A protein has these predicted regions:
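Catalytic pocket-lining loop regions of alpha/beta-barrel enzymes
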Residues: 6-8, 161-295
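Acidic active-site catalytic centers that drive phospho-/nucleotidyl reactions
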Residues: 32, 212, 299
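Active-site-proximal loop/turn and secondary-structure-junction residues that shape catalytic pockets
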Residues: 70-71, 117, 145-147, 188-192, ...
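Short helix-capping segments at alpha-helix termini
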Residues: 97-104, 134-135, 202-207, 243, ...
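Mid-to-C-terminal alpha-helical segments outside catalytic/metal-binding sites
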Residues: 1-29, 45-53, 62-63, 283-284, ...
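Short, electropositive alpha-helical surface patch
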Residues: 80-95, 125-133, 195-209, 263-281, ...
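Tryptophan-centric aromatic hotspots in well-structured domains and transmembrane helices
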Residues: 38, 66, 89, 114, ...
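Mid-domain alpha/beta scaffold segments of enzyme catalytic cores
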Residues: 2-180, 200, 220-224
Length: 351
């Protein structure tokens, strides 16, 4: 069991059970484009827990993308190679899902690893080992980048130095990813978006995936209802949208750094409440990037402290009620399938 301190809400299954919903549009295929798995002192979320969430939700989740979270790092060996353990772990989970015994979904069909880009050009041998260990499922890397000068703004067990994405070693590592046709998943706050835009301009062959709506901060010096914060975030996202090698995950609404307070209520939020609260962010992102560059993702179990899996997907489906069938397909599975080169789409019938 891993000892990891993270500023995430505790998952209270008894509280979540106080509100359940039947799935909306249960036939609509879904690729969960961002989730984690771990076994920590604060809780376990592994194959059975993820599979149970999928099955009890009633939604048609056909595939998922595993994203690094420092799970099962190798105990021994060079520090730079310890993240290979997480890739092995996720690949093993993927093999379990591929057996057909779990939720009829291809869980962890794509893997985003955590090799440090600070190794620069020296990443190449490690990347080749990672691809082999993943069983061909490796699609990219993610490094801790979210930094804010105010200590009240925190979202990760690892706080990186300021400006890491601007450093020369990191950018050489990013270029190495591009040479291997691997993407870079990025979790930063809205105050850092210009750094990522600069990186995207410098390496136009690198596919960059912006996690969690571009990290609009709603705590500490910022307020979720602050119009200045919203405009600053929108300006940063607009500059990113101008770059064709950038796409966005619509996710992370249950992170404490976002500033929503649904977890403080006596009962969990319903999907209508969530959709209403999220709509300004959703509409802005889709208007800037287009549905073909946006994908929904659960960010479970991080976001499970604020709402259940089924309610989350119902909220997403409420967000797209005015969207065309093609736009809905883009948001729920096609963008993720294209971005991460997922073969499960061959079996999807979204008609």
């Amino acid at each position: 069991m891993e000892i990891v301190t993270a500023p995430h809400l505790a998952v209270r299954n008894e509280w979540l059970a106080l509100h359940r919903e039947a799935p909306l549009q249960p036939e609509l295929p879904i690729i969960d484009a961002h989730h984690h798995l771990w076994d920590r002192q604060t809780g376990r979320y592994l194959t059975h827990e993820f599979s149970d969430d999928i099955q009890t939700s009633g939604h048609r989740v056909v595939s998922s993308v595993y994203v690094q979270c420092r799970s099962m790092l190798r105990r021994d060996g060079p520090e730079t190679l310890k993240p290979l353990g997480e890739i092995e772990f996720a690949s093993g989970i993927a093999a379990m899902f591929a057996s057909g015994h779990y939720a009829n979904a291809l869980g962890c069909e794509a893997i985003i690893g955590g090799l440090s880009l600070l190794a620069g050009d020296a990443m190449q041998p490690a990347i080749e080992r990672a691809i082999a260990l993943s069983g061909g499922r490796l699609r990219g890397m993610r490094n801790p980048l979210a930094w804010h000068p105010d200590p009240r703004v925190t979202s990760s067990p690892v706080t990186p130095p300021a400006g890491l994405a601007q450093s020369a070693p990191f950018r050489r590592g990013a270029a190495c990813l591009a040479r291997h046709a691997l993407s870079l998943d990025v979790w930063v706050y809205h105050t850092q978006l210009e750094e990522i835009a600069d990186l995207a301009r410098e390496i136009p062959t690198l596919q960059i995936v912006i996690d969690h709506c571009g990290g609009p901060v709603g705590v500490g010096p910022c307020s979720e209802r602050d119009p200045d914060m919203f405009q600053q975030w929108r300006n940063g996202m607009r500059r990113l949208a101008e770059l064709p090698n950038v796409c966005v995950k619509i996710s992370g609404f249950g992170m404490t750094v976002r500033g929503f307070h649904f977890a403080a209520a006596e009962t969990p939020p319903d999907s209508q409440m969530l959709a209403q609260a999220w709509m300004p962010w959703f509409e802005t992102i889709v208007s800037l990037f287009g549905a073909e560059r946006c994908m929904f993702a659960s960010n479970f179990p991080v976001d499970k402290g604020m709402f259940s899996y089924g309610v989350f997907w119902n909220a997403c489906k409420r967000l797209v009620q005015q969207a065309s069938p093609d736009e809905q397909a883009q948001l729920f599975w096609r963008t993720a399938a294209t971005c991460y080169r997922l073969t499960s789409v061959e079996n999807i019938n979204d008609q």
